[in-house]
């Protein structure tokens, strides 16, 4: 919205500042953080009253989790309120990439909201049907993938690039759509599986958002993209503003989600944020780098896949409990040890992922 003021820059010179992505990214970050800080208590109190018993606690989970009973969920509403309001104010609304990323985030968030609603009302960890949920997620993601492919310059817009190898580019043609949809849905559900302890998911999400904000800015700048020999994707620099809003909203949410959490993110937030990261990775042509930067989320998702698959084949479990953060709790790690150590892993993986920009 503020980009509109640049039309009057000839008469009011200070309005030129809104042309700069870096300035608007900082503004988006501060704005979303303030929105969550200011409206967070009201939203939390409202959810606590409406939800009553709050998010149900898994009966087979660590004993320390039972003291969290009664904590409200759907904290993603706070996060998305901050992100959407901030993006409407600071982002360039003429960018198709901004709208696609927000569409996926809102769509996935709506699915998560319905899932959270069913869990709270039924007081059960059985929410939305898994098949129906995945079906709707893939539909939303496929529409987004098609839009991204058409918005770019073919055949590159439907191609897959690889880190470390600058010349290796594979044109997926129409197979790009199912591949990109898989990345978006996979990212959304991987973040969802990570969100099991106070503060565990939101910090790695912010780390990944900061990393991809940097990647988006570089990918959308012809000079930087040429210097680093990464693929130039016009218009994706604007996604740095969106991810700046994610970081700000994440900081605001962490204030209330710090242990002992006053509210849980819920599927409302985790699916929305994960889907957003996956969509940005697809738009910037850094899908494989997402698996590195978001390696913590990949590890959490793989632990569940391995646990379920191995149990179905042998009747035995690989981990004491899945996702893997619960395994370490069962091994005797305190919740704070698991959370902080996983944060460290997320930061290290982000640095490795960012190093791929230069190591080509």
UniProtKB/Swiss-Prot annotation:
GO CC annotation: plasma membrane
UniProt keyword Coiled coil, yes or no: no
Database matches in Pfam families: Glycos_transf_4, MraY_sig1
Its membrane topology: Multi-pass membrane protein
MF terms in GO: metal ion binding; phospho-N-acetylmuramoyl-pentapeptide-transferase activity; UDP-N-acetylmuramoyl-L-alanyl-D-glutamyl-meso-2,6-diaminopimelyl-D-alanyl-D-alanine:undecaprenyl-phosphate transferase activity
Localization in the cell: Cell inner membrane
GO biological process: cell division; cell wall organization; peptidoglycan biosynthetic process; regulation of cell shape
EC number: 2.7.8.13
UniProt keyword list: Cell cycle, Cell division, Cell inner membrane, Cell membrane, Cell shape, Cell wall biogenesis/degradation, Magnesium, Membrane, Metal-binding, Peptidoglycan synthesis, Transferase, Transmembrane, Transmembrane helix
Top-level EC class: transferase
Alphabetized PROSITE patterns for the sequence: MRAY_1, MRAY_2
Reactions listed under catalytic activity: UDP-N-acetyl-alpha-D-muramoyl-L-alanyl-gamma-D-glutamyl-meso-2,6-diaminopimeloyl-D-alanyl-D-alanine + di-trans,octa-cis-undecaprenyl phosphate = di-trans,octa-cis-undecaprenyl diphospho-N-acetyl-alpha-D-muramoyl-L-alanyl-D-glutamyl-meso-2,6-diaminopimeloyl-D-alanyl-D-alanine + UMP
Keyword Cell membrane: yes
InterPro entries for this protein: Glycosyl_transferase_4 (IPR000715), PNAcMuramoyl-5peptid_Trfase (IPR003524), PNAcMuramoyl-5peptid_Trfase_CS (IPR018480)
Membrane-crossing segments per the record: 27-47, 71-91, 93-113, 128-148, 168-188, 199-219, 239-259, 262-282, 288-308, 337-357
Pathway this chain belongs to: Cell wall biogenesis; peptidoglycan biosynthesis
Cofactor entry: Mg(2+)
Similarity remark: Belongs to the glycosyltransferase 4 family. MraY subfamily.
Task performed by this protein: Catalyzes the initial step of the lipid cycle reactions in the biosynthesis of the cell wall peptidoglycan: transfers peptidoglycan precursor phospho-MurNAc-pentapeptide from UDP-MurNAc-pentapeptide onto the lipid carrier undecaprenyl phosphate, yielding undecaprenyl-pyrophosphoryl-MurNAc-pentapeptide, known as lipid I.
Protein name per the record: Phospho-N-acetylmuramoyl-pentapeptide-transferase
Organism of derivation: Brucella canis (strain ATCC 23365 / NCTC 10854 / RM-666)
